[in-house]
Amino acid sequence: MTSILKSVLLATIIVNLSSVKALADVTSQQVWDGLRTAMTASGFKITASETRKGDRLTIGDLQMNRRVQDPGSDASGTISLSVSSLQFLDKGDGTVTIVLPDQIPVILHVNSPEDGDFDVQFDLTQRNLVIRASGKPDEIRHDYAAEAVGLDLRKLVLDRTEVPGADVHADLSLVNVSGTSISAIQTDRNYTQNLNIGRMSYKASISLPGPS
């Protein structure tokens, strides 16, 4: 269980930072369409509402769901993210700013032949995250930076029994995160990623009752 949980937590942070395939010098609608296309290509099924006001496009009640598989075992399941509001702002200088909420709830459900079924609820958090898109339609550059990005465990359910909060603690923290992603359209769409992490820490403590 620890293996798939740790890998999914880290992958969730990286996917949400690096898969923002935005387009500059185009409309906010095209920026959102690019993000939605990239997330769909990553395996997510997406539903959301759209509201426009001036240069601001707001995506409300964004729900993202995809299947996950632990490559080291037979464990598989689903991961769901719920984003209350995602905003795209045209800065008027050929760049687009993407604004994410400070906290995004994530739910992971796993079926494991070895460990049984379990559900994990945690929050994807960020502090002072800035995402800026620029470039041209056939070569898109997006830069991002944050003081911190993390995942905090909120609930753990094993075989339909919730583990008391006092008995389970887990978090993953990335400090001083920055990076660049360039999307170039040639015959296919190619991505070049550069992710810098000042410090990463992961800790977990789980106390489970023994058999009665």
Question: Can you say where each PLM-predicted feature lies in the sequence?
Answer:
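Bacterial N-terminal signal peptides
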Residues: 8-18
